[in-house]
Amino acid sequence: MSSALLAVELAYWQQTVIRALVGLVAVLLPAGTLVYLFLFKMMSFMQSRLGPMEAGPYGSMQLLAEVGKFLQKEDLVPRAADRIVFKLAPFVVLISTFLLVLVIPAGPDLWFIDIDTGIFLALAVSSISVIGVLMAGWASASKYSLIGGLRAAGQLVAYELPLVLAVMGVVIQAGTLNMQGIVMAQATGEIFGWGGIGNPFIITQFVGFAIFIVAVQAELTQPPFDMPVAESEIVTGYLTEYSGLRFLLFFIGEFATAGIFAALAATLFLGGWYVPGLDPTSNLFNVIGPAVLMGKMILVAFLIFWFRFTYPRFREDQLQQLAWKVLIPLALANIVVTGVLKVVL
């Protein structure tokens, strides 16, 4: 029976659904768990304390304990809220995170969706979360939620452009929009004629990498870009009226998105699953590739969270000035320089 089932030719949409479900279980949940634990342990060490220690060995089951706590809480809906939109908003945000997983390769033959415009798809679906945040802010029927939702929308729109422009330098240098092609371009490339370690784009596209990390920080609405949920000003912004399971979905979405953006940065700038000095077409990477990618993801996540615990919150005017007067001009200059060097060299 098993061989007969394996021999059945599945339709493309069926294959996509199966890969998506596997991606949710095999990638998104572990990524969210790892990033969550890493965040709390890192925050604890920076504050000279131990952090979570009771739930599992060394606090490794802390996320499950948090999930159990939230599932026991009452799921309230404000009386004046738009009930349908209010309930759908967390799922829209989570879908954005989930779709990002599908285009990130973990080995030469390990991918969920391999399309020629993979990076374009990743950037497109990353902006879906704006819709969910606006839905949450508007449907809650609360002034704090609405202000938080509008702040988040303005912030995400402002920083989506630097994010896209930062990636364009990578696309120009790699000569492809395909995520697997970008990894292979780094594995087989050269740094000004020297190919000893390939060409990790963090070296030749360091400006783009820095812009990408700052823009990701703003997309995640984490400090110092946490104006949409500023507790001292608007309680918790668009999350104010959420509790129980729906608050948990936002909670999981935040940390899973941080992990997936870190994996995306690792793929675009650190060579993804590739290890310098080895043959990128070797089947070995189908075995060790996921672990290599996970290690690089943790490295980028450390950088993202380091900013979170180091810098104070920006004002709204400072946030917009940083995007429009600093990051966008820098990203455009990076594209021009990359294009010129691509033609000359």
Locate each region found by the language model.
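Selective transmembrane helix interface/packing segments
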Residues: S2-L345
